Curated annotation (Swiss-Prot):
This is Small ribosomal subunit protein uS14. Keywords: Ribonucleoprotein, Ribosomal protein, RNA-binding, rRNA-binding. It holds the Pfam family Ribosomal_S14. The keyword Transferase does not apply. Binds 16S rRNA, required for the assembly of 30S particles and may also be responsible for determining the conformation of the 16S rRNA at the A site. Transmembrane segments: none annotated. Belongs to the universal ribosomal protein uS14 family. Part of the 30S ribosomal subunit. Contacts proteins S3 and S10. It comes from the Bacteria.
Length: 89
């Protein structure tokens, strides 16, 4: 389980990215790089990281499912992820 403070920080960054998305796009299209530099650092989408939806783990994230490899494996073995089953050949 990730620290609650890290999970909250990621939520705050995602909210800031969403808040400034239109303004960033307009400044970028106009080529106003000084204006872009004046925006908050957290307004850049590059600073946002993917985290597991269940426990907030930042590493080994699978985008298609929104889970880390550990939780994906656990839920897949239980059969709780539709369309996923163990490979056999």
């Amino acid at each position: 389980m990730a620290k609650k403070s890290k999970i909250e920080k990621e939520k705050r960054i995602e909210a800031t990215v969403a808040k400034y998305a239109a303004k960033r796009a307009a400044l970028k299209a106009a080529g106003d790089y000084q204006g872009l530099a004046k925006l908050p650092r957290d307004a850049s989408p590059v600073r946002a990281h993917h985290r597991d939806l269940t426990d907030g783990r930042p590493h080994a994230y699978m985008r298609a499912f929104g889970l880390s490899r550990l939780n994906f494996r656990q839920l897949a073995h239980k059969g709780q992820i539709p369309g996923v089953r163990k490979a056999s050949w």
